[in-house]
């Protein structure tokens, strides 16, 4: 019995002597852990901050670009359409697109279908054709490309590969006619795809009914 008590006492003393060293070692390891994690976190944080900053700068550049770019207002200035004009819109897409009031009404409809960029692109091409200054033409052509042709743009219009190749060649030396093929393709797309739906839309029917009622009252 006495020998067993002596042995137990020795074990307790040995355990007591080991505890400070073990605790110190654990404390040291604990200190290294947070420092290492902090270092990693700082590196990751720096990378994330740089990424966010670059994205913000790009966003600001794009916003500035768009503000300077088209000069195309939310709607064109035009007198209110007459009943005769609105009836003429139903005769052909060309007659609709010839008048500012017709383009405004059609553009309002395209906005409901999230395809307003087609009209914006067409209008930008029309503006480009009116320019004669070489430097202005080059700048407008570049902006049109970035806004409506680039696959990175949220307002990219739908064009086939052949037309895109033509544009890329034309952009080597931009002119008023750089986007003629693309403009025709988008015009045809609006004519065949969006125009029939516009003629059956509430926007067109409400306008026609309103003008008809005013005509009767007069």
Swiss-Prot record:
Listed Basic and acidic residues bias regions: 1-10
This protein's record includes keyword Lipoprotein: yes
Keywords associated with the record: Cytoplasm, Glycoprotein, Lipoprotein, Membrane, Nucleus, Palmitate, Signal transduction inhibitor, Ubl conjugation
Topology in the lipid bilayer: Lipid-anchor
InterPro entries given in the database record: RGS, RGS_sf, RGS_subdomain_2
Processing after translation: Fatty acylated. Heavily palmitoylated in the cysteine string motif.
PROSITE patterns named among the record's database cross-references: RGS
Cytoplasm in keyword set: yes
Disordered as annotated region, ranges: 1-26
Subcellular location: Membrane; Nucleus; Cytoplasm
GO biological process, one term: negative regulation of signal transduction
Biased composition (Polar residues): 14-26
Sequence ranges assigned to domain RGS in this UniProt record: 92-208
GO CC annotation, single: membrane
Signal peptide, first to last residue: none
Role noted for this protein: Inhibits signal transduction by increasing the GTPase activity of G protein alpha subunits thereby driving them into their inactive GDP-bound form. Binds selectively to G(z)-alpha and G(alpha)-i2 subunits, accelerates their GTPase activity and regulates their signaling activities. The G(z)-alpha activity is inhibited by the phosphorylation and palmitoylation of the G-protein. Negatively regulates mu-opioid receptor-mediated activation of the G-proteins.
Subunit structure: Forms a complex with G(alpha)z/i2 subunits and mu-opioid receptors; the formation of this complex results in mu-opioid receptor desensitization. Interacts with OPRM1.
Protein name as catalogued: Regulator of G-protein signaling 20
The species this protein was found in: Gallus gallus
């Amino acid at each position: 019995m006495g020998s067993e008590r002596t042995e137990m006492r020795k074990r307790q003393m040995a355990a007591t002597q080991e505890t400070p060293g073990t605790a110190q070692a654990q404390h040291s390891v604990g200190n290294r852990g947070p420092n290492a994690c902090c270092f990693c976190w700082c590196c990751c944080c720096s990378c994330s901050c740089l990424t966010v900053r670059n994205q913000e700068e790009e966003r600001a550049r794009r916003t500035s670009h768009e503000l300077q770019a088209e000069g195309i207002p939310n709607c064109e200035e035009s007198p209110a359409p007459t009943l005769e004009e609105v009836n003429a819109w139903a005769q052909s897409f060309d007659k609709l697109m010839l008048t500012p009031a017709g383009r405004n009404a059609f553009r309002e409809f395209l906005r409901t279908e999230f395809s307003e960029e087609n009209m914006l692109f067409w209008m930008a091409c029309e503006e480009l054709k009116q320019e004669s200054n070489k430097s202005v033409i080059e700048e407008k052509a570049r902006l049109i490309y970035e806004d409506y042709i680039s696959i990175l743009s949220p307002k990219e219009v739908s064009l086939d590969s052949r037309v895109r190749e033509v544009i890329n060649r034309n952009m080597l030396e931009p002119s008023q006619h750089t986007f003629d093929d693309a403009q025709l393709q988008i015009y045809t797309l609006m004519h065949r795809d969006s125009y029939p739906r516009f003629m059956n839309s509430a926007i067109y029917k409400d306008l026609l009914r309103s003008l008809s009622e005013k005509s009767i009252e007069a």
